[in-house]
UniProtKB/Swiss-Prot annotation:
Cross-referenced PANTHER family: GTPASE DER
Protein task: GTPase that plays an essential role in the late steps of ribosome biogenesis.
Family label: Belongs to the TRAFAC class TrmE-Era-EngA-EngB-Septin-like GTPase superfamily. EngA (Der) GTPase family.
HAMAP family: GTPase_Der (MF_00195)
Residues annotated as binding GTP 2: 183-190, 230-234, 295-298
Protein name, as recorded: GTPase Der
GO MF, any single term: ribosome binding
CDD domains referenced in this protein's UniProt entry, alphabetically: EngA1, EngA2
Highest taxon of source: Bacteria
Protein's UniProt keywords contain GTP-binding: yes
Keyword terms: GTP-binding, Nucleotide-binding, Repeat, Ribosome biogenesis
Disulfide pairings: none
KH-like domain ranges (all copies): 351-435
């Protein structure tokens, strides 16, 4: 499982700045998608080929008893309990405060690995700063400047070092597509899981991963193997009752990251909520294949169905790549078609795309609609090849590609997805410009 890094600390020590620094490499991928709402308290980051999840808690006051500060502290407590590593941010310019001491005492009792991060350390004597915060009793502090990026890469490498690389974890399993079933509480996720698995089929075993291992549950439907990625507590035999389900954003995000295909469950009786859109946005952000299951379809009338379709068209327009299915998890209606789309989305996400055909498709797109000029230069797209899968990544080489507008990128995405029938998976396009080595010479 990809490590979960939780940022804690009192207000105004730079948690949000560090969060943005840790997640910026992935944020840019979908920031321009129309209609996409984003919860800025969580995100994904990457260093080299290592992915990780980052959670930004609000200013943490462990002794707050009521009001909004108490609610913020309660939410931070849940994040701390589910963290693999805690980054305890303190302010190097302000020095150690009684509030820092209170948080440190709380974190010592939490039983999670903690790294003390001294932020705003630019221009300060690192040895003096480290000595001041060493007294917190949480190990040697690490000084950084989140605003300037100084020391951040070393911090991430230190944090990720104890965790196995992604390929080591994935090598431990070979049981078909990894499927995560996600959604907000009481939409029917547990009913769908039980319908897919059957009580007698639940076989749980730990995948090697972090200190809080995921559970992989293999199951078979229609003669095909699948693996359900479970981080939400489906660890015992028997039914998992929706009434006792406890929604956890972090566990949902972890399941999405571990999956090849995500099934997002919606409730036909309810309008699309911000939480639904946030989960869908994170699926897109991570590049996972997606199938949307509209549950309890049999329990609503035609008026409600029409209203829901309008609501989805407005709030989930950024999921145009995904298939939507009307199902009844309780009656097991629509399940076969749902799994067929899971198979199709997985196949699309893992597609091998030939370089000659990619290049021909790109050239046909340019002939139909050339990229707009930027200043005096018109971009020239020369050839394309595949750069990755799950999601498929297409790398385009050429000249003057640094300022391709987002609208043209989306045009290319649609063209490639239609040409290669990539239904069910998002697509990434990367541009590689051949820079003129003589451009800066007199």
């Amino acid at each position: 499982m990809k490590p979960t890094i939780v940022l804690v600390g009192r207000p105004n020590v730079g948690k949000s700045t560090l969060f943005n620094r840790l997640t910026k490499t992935r944020d840019a991928l979908v920031a321009d998608q129309p209609g996409l709402t984003r919860d800025r308290h969580y995100g994904v980051g990457r260093v080299g080929d290592r992915d990780y999840l980052v959670v930004d808690t609000a200013g943490f006051d462990p002794v707050a008893k009521d009001g909004i500060m108490h609610e913020m502290a309660r939410q931070a407590e849940q994040a701390i309990a589910e963290a693999d590593v805690l980054l305890f941010l303190v302010d190097g310019r302000a020095g150690r405060t009684p509030h820092d001491d209170q948080i440190a005492a709380h974190l010592r009792r939490a039983g999670r690995p903690v790294v003390v991060v001294v932020n705003k350390a630019e221009g300060l004597d690192r040895a003096t700063v480290a000595a001041d915060f060493h007294a917190l009793g949480l190990g040697a502090p690490l000084a950084v400047s989140a605003a300037h990026g100084d020391g951040v890469k070393a911090l991430v490498e230190l944090v990720l070092a104890p965790f196995p690389a992604d390929d080591e974890v994935e090598a431990a399993e070979d049981a078909g597509p990894r499927v995560a079933i996600v959604g907000r509480p009481n939409v029917g996720k547990s009913t769908l899981v039980n319908t897919l698995l059957g009580e007698e089929r639940v076989i749980a075993f730990d995948m090697p991963g972090t200190t809080r291992d995921a559970i992989a549950i293999p199951f078979e439907r229609g003669g095909k193997q699948y693996t359900l990625i479970d981080t939400a507590g489906l660890r015992r035999r028997g039914k998992v009752f929706e009434a006792v389900e406890k929604f956890s954003v972090i566990k949902t995000l972890q399941a999405i990251q571990e999956a090849n295909v995500v099934v997002l469950v919606l409730d036909a009786a309810q309008d699309i909520s911000d939480q639904d859109a946030h989960i869908a946005g994170f699926v897109l952000d991570t590049g996972r294949a997606l199938v949307v299951a509209i549950n309890k379809w049999d329990a609503v009338d035609d008026y409600r169905r029409a209203r829901l379709k309008e609501d989805m068209a407005r709030k989930l327009a950024f999921l145009s790549f995904a298939r939507f299915h009307q199902i009844s998890a309780l009656r097991a209606e629509g399940i076969a078609a749902l799994l067929k789309s899971v198979d199709g989305a997985y196949a699309a996400a893992m597609s091998n795309l030939s370089t000659p055909r990619l290049t021909r498709t790109m050239q046909a797109a340019v002939a139909k609609q050339a990229p707009p000029r930027h200043g005096s230069a018109r971009p020239k797209l020369r050839y394309a090849h595949q750069g990755g899968m799950n999601p498929p990544v297409i790398v385009i080489h050429g000249n003057a590609l640094d300022h391709i507008p987002n609208s043209y990128v989306r045009f290319l995405e649609r063209t490639f997805m239609e040409a290669f029938k990539l239904q069910g998976t998002p697509l990434r396009i990367q541009f590689r410009t051949a820079h003129n080595p003589y451009a800066t010479k007199a």
